């Protein structure tokens, strides 16, 4: 007799098969569709980060509760991603499962990953313009803009090894959150499954290359283009943020974090779970 108290959860092997089918489906989409989905994902990621910045803007950074609440708020971006079915670079690296199955070539995988990254960047750029012209930078006596500057500045002083490691741990959490969401039978199930892993990576200061594509370039724009009244309200100056340059962002943060994100998602989650659960399948 069937146990009526048993949970109706997907078996691990079945989750791996679901992830592999999703990977193949994403790769099979047209380039235009992939780019538009990626643009939406970039917007959603920027929305989540904006929520996070709005919460921490006037709160002491030493308070653990601030990091916890900020992390919970940031989860909104990933909830939108999951609900709307968009393509984020850090989760799209899991499509390497389709390559290991022989469905696609490395060239196809790389083109798809680059297309998604470009789409994410385009979406972030569009939303960043909206934020800039909305005047949010000057809100709360410029505290919101100051929060952006300090958040971005803090990301620019990691060593290469630290950035890669933080990137690995970040996308490990992101892809595990996605993997856990495959267990859900309802929308509520999927959302609840994602909350803690995403909150962990944000509260712990792990590095996400697409999220950084929003906050660091935005901080660079503030440093170079913010009007004098902003600096007066902030009681600071652009000279206090010397690390916020495009070249330093690319070399010290973007590239090593992106490498870490790829390792965390494609290797530690996607390939490992495929090797564990799907290797014996024909």
Regions found by a protein language model. Name each.
Residues 1-282:
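Alpha-helical transmembrane segments and their helix-helix packing motifs
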């Amino acid at each position: 007799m069937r146990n009526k108290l048993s949970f109706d959860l997907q078996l691990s092997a079945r989750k791996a098969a679901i992830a592999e089918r999703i990977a193949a489906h994403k790769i099979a989409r047209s380039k235009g569709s992939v780019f538009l989905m990626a643009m939406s994902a970039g917007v959603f990621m920027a929305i989540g980060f904006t929520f996070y910045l709005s919460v921490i803007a006037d709160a002491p950074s030493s308070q653990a509760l601030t990091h916890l609440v900020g992390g919970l708020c940031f989860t909104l971006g990933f909830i939108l991603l999951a609900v709307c079915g968009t393509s984020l670079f850090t989760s799209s690296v899991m499509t390497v499962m389709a390559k290991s199955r022989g469905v696609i070539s490395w060239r196809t995988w790389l083109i798809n990953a680059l297309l998604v990254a470009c789409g994410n960047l385009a979406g972030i750029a569009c939303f960043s313009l909206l934020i800039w012209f909305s005047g949010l930078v000057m809100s709360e006596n410029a505290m919101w803009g100051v929060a952006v500057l300090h958040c971005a500045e803090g990301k620019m002083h990691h060593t290469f090894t630290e950035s890669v490691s933080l990137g690995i741990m970040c996308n490990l959490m992101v892809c595990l959150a996605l993997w856990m969401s495959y267990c859900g039978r309802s929308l509520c199930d999927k959302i609840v499954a994602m909350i803690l892993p995403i909150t962990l990576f944000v509260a712990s200061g792990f590095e996400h290359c697409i999220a950084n594509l929003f906050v660091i370039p935005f901080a660079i724009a503030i440093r170079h283009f913010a009007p004098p009244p902003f600096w007066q309200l902030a009681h600071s100056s652009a000279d206090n943020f010397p690390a916020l340059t495009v070249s330093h962002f690319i070399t010290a943060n973007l590239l090593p974090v992106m490498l870490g994100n790829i390792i965390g998602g494609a290797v530690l989650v996607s390939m490992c779970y495929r090797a564990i659960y799907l290797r014996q399948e024909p």
